[in-house]
């Protein structure tokens, strides 16, 4: 059974200031000889409401650029959407915390994004003395990425990630943090 995740912008169909009914229907239009085709909705359906300038759904990707015992360079890549017709001067910020909730890195950068554009921005952060992730020690960090305008946060996305170094070559095979 395949699970398909998708997003549909219904902005043009919503009547602001009025009650709106949203109906979600799945039609499995392909005939099947099986008594049960498996079609339908098996997970929650969510209504996402966003500002015209926002982080794309599932639009944050956190990547370990480099790592050793003393420092890890982390790239927080954020896909920003500007559905407004005018150019916006906004900021992108990111904060990384350890499992205890202590801030281990944070930063921000100004962004100028044209109207009706989606673009990805990379913010580099550095974590001192990182706790590495592996199968025996699944150390996790939390990220919070936000976009905002002036003093107002417009959108935020959060999640978890592990800091690790992955290597793959024909001689040593797959290594995580230098170990097989």
Residue spans for each PLM region:
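Short proline/glycine- and polar residue-rich coil/turn motifs
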Residues: 1-2, 14-15, 110-119
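Short strand-edge motifs at loop-to-beta-strand transitions and within beta-strands
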Residues: 4-8, 117-125
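Short glycine/proline/serine/threonine-rich loop/turn segments at secondary-structure transition edges
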Residues: 14-19, 87, 117-118, 127-142
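Hydrophobic/tyrosine-rich beta-strand signature of extracellular beta-sandwich/beta-rich modules
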Residues: 24, 94, 143-145
């Amino acid at each position: 059974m395949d699970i398909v995740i998708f997003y549909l912008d219904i902005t043009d169909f919503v009547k602001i200031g009025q009650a709106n009914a949203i109906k979600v229907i799945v039609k499995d239009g392909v005939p099947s000889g099986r008594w049960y085709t498996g079609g339908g909705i098996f997970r929650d359906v969510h209504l996402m409401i966003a500002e015209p300038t926002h982080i794309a759904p599932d639009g944050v990707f956190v990547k370990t650029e480099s790592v050793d015992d003393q420092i890890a360079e982390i790239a927080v890549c954020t896909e920003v959407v500007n559905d407004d017709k005018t150019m916006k001067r906004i900021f992108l910020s990111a904060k990384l915390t350890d499992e205890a909730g202590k801030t281990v890195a944070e930063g921000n950068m100004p962004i100028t994004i044209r109207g009706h554009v989606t673009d990805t921005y990379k913010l580099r952060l550095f974590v001192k003395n990182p706790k590495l992730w592996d199968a025996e020690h699944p150390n996790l960090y939390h990220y919070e990425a936000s976009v905002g305008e002036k003093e107002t946060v417009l959108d935020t996305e959060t999640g978890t990630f592990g800091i690790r170094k992955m290597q793959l070559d024909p001689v040593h095979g797959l290594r995580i943090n230098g170990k097989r």
